[in-house]
Amino acid sequence: MYEQVVEYWYVVLPLVFILHKVFDMWHTRRLMKQLGAAPVTNQLHDNFFGIINGWKHLSSRKKVELKNIMIINLPIRKFQVWVHMLVPSLEQSSSSQKIRRNIKALLATQFSDFSLGKRHTLFKPLLGDGIFTLDGQGWKHSRAMLRPQFAREQVAHVTSLEPHFQLLKKHMVKNKGGFFDIQELFFRFTVDSATEFLFGESVHSLKDETIGSYQDDIDFVGRKDFAESFNKAQEYLAIRTLVQDFYYLVNNQEFRDCNKLVHKFTNYYVQRALDATPEELEKQSGYVFLYELVKQTRGPNVLRDQSLNILLAGRDTSAGLLSFAVFELARNPHIWAKLREDVESQFGLGEQSRIEEITFESLKRCGYLKAFLNETLRVYPSVPRNFRIATKNTTLPRGGGSDGNSPVLVKKGEAVSYGINSTHLDPVYYGDDAAEFRPERWNEPSTRKLGWAYLPFNGGPRICLGQQFALTEAGYVLVRLAQSFDTLELKPPVVYPPKRLTNLTMSLQDGTIVKID
């Protein structure tokens, strides 16, 4: 029998494939009937098992144009529901949804029907068991443990930013009159402020001889190489995410060395927190994340992993937000002028700057600053696309039937991808000028009822704990920039929209090249 199968493989294989497809179609129809679902209204197929579409996703990342391909090259239709296959999971379909009710169901009302899938496995070499990698009870425990930390740090965080801003300002003044990449400086600024917030001591990546400031000669925990190693490790995580089932192929020596150095650095501060006496912990001046967290848990790996999870979010999202913000301010002089007027009325400008009045509460009172940050996050969300994996056979409320108003089936193990970027640029929610960068829209009644059409910090139970942290940091830096400099200018020729680089978060592929005065 075996010999016959081998001999006639060219007959057996197509037959097995056909039988599998027939059974799958029957099983799908049966599930649709049980769950009251209808066929997907709009589908995108490449007629070659999803390989072509999957290759587009991978190649688009190489060209650093992932966001543009998703918005322009894929069909934007009324219900924005299509099915495409992602390499290498060629047997799993991925439904891409763009309807508020579907996103709400995915992230909130049907939260328990979906999980993060392989994220824990993909990210574990760097991030371990943390709030951004865990599902289920592990995630619930992490969130309960971390939530208080982001309620207590708000006021203290503002005052701790000024020393880092002074270093940032020195770099900018050094380049005054010439063009330079401020995005690179923002990434250094945010890693400095984030490590001080987390560990009580900054990596001081902004300190260098070009501004007459030097790091300590003693570097026994890898402080000098920490930021670069953390960046490189994240690049590998992004690749592991893209290749999914073949993640184990992305595990070379450079990746392992970066993880080792990052862990060594973090373990040093974890151990220092564990060695501190209760009296020493209470006497600490200012807020330190690790010193507060060690009061709740004594597990070294827990402390390290949670710290790195928070660092990933707190550093990269803030740097990206600031970079896109300055890009738009330099591209739109009238917006920069309005922002400076708002800052002047609240905190003064130049020599009349009242830095001591910049607080968590006073930043919230800056109406135009708030509108500007909202618009920046709308047009440039930190995580433009995300996905969830169905943990059981279920449905989403919209996208099926001839009119798109019927539920659609999502089978267990299937990936549901939702595009924050395309939702944020949808004229249905933001009007005919949705593609235009216009902060004033946030003072209009139409933006008060957006709900699930505006998700810069995700939504539902997994909504970002540190959103106020990010907004406060970005607001503080923009206020201080407005107080310190009169003009911002982009290096010509200006490419718009700018090319985006999407790894785990989004930034500008070519940097933010500006001139200040």
Swiss-Prot record:
What's a Gene Ontology MF term here?
Answer: iron ion binding
User: Which Pfam family is one of this chain's hits?
Assistant: p450
Q: Where does heme bind?
A: C464
**Record's note on what induces expression:** By various alkanes.
Q: Which domain of life is it from?
A: Eukaryota
What species was this sequence derived from? Answer: Candida tropicalis (Yeast)
Q: Does the keyword Metal-binding apply?
A: yes
Which keywords, in A-to-Z order, does the entry hold?
Answer: Heme, Iron, Metal-binding, Monooxygenase, Oxidoreductase
- Named cofactor requirement(s): heme
The free-text function statement in the UniProt record for this protein reads: Together with an NADPH cytochrome P450 the enzyme system catalyzes the terminal hydroxylation as the first step in the assimilation of alkanes and fatty acids. Preferentially hydroxylates lauric acid.
InterPro entries of this UniProt entry? Cyt_P450 (IPR001128), Cyt_P450_CS (IPR017972), Cyt_P450_E_CYP52_ascomycetes (IPR002974), Cyt_P450_E_CYP52_fungi (IPR047146), Cyt_P450_E_grp-II (IPR002402), Cyt_P450_sf (IPR036396)
**Top enzyme category:** oxidoreductase
Name-wise, this protein is: Cytochrome P450 52A8
Q: Which PANTHER family match?
A: P450, PUTATIVE (EUROFUNG)-RELATED
Q: What is its EC number?
A: 1.14.14.-
Q: Which family does it belong to?
A: Belongs to the cytochrome P450 family.
